Amino acid sequence: YGAQPRLLGPKLNPNDLDEEGRLKAEATLIEAVDDAEYFGARGIAFLAGKWSEETKDEAYAQLLKTTVNVCRYAAMKNMNVELEIFDYDVDKAALIGPAPLAAKFAADVRSYCPNFGLLVDLSHFPICHESSADVIRTCRPYITHLHFGNAVADPEAKGYGDLHQRFGYPGSANDVQDL
């Protein structure tokens, strides 16, 4: 169950430094677990929120708190939770973000909750300035879902961003051979 729109639409941030805002995001994700259960899904996927360099450590701690709480709730329903790695400086500007930070975060969450994993998306690798080999190698122990998408990484090119263009789209980063 993709819970990303539930956060993006109302601009909720699971790593919000404001505790009230973080709790709203957490409540929305817990509702998403209930919806996922109703629809027969085995779990949910969500994304980290926006961040700034000055408060990165605090945002990380907030995201960890939210994620562990959601994972514990999901575990009571025998469900899984996945964090989708997004870009950290382009469009979504999500805290998780770069593969090394994603792997560290996954290890931290898994120390509390074995029902957690990472959702990695081929379309996000180029806009995260990373190669598929590096991301998969770095995050491999934690990958529970791999999505095959495409993106245009050149800000000057038509279709710039994570728009899931077809493979081989002019100026895009991924083609059939990348699969």
Predicted regions: what they are:
Residues Y1-L7, E20, L29, I143, ...:
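Domain-start "cap" segments at the beginnings of catalytic or binding domains
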Residues Y1-R6, G49-W51, F86-V90, D121-I127, ...:
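Active-site beta-loop-alpha junctions enriched in small/polar residues
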Residues G2, A61, G168-P170:
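Compositionally biased, intrinsically disordered low-complexity regions enriched in proline and serine
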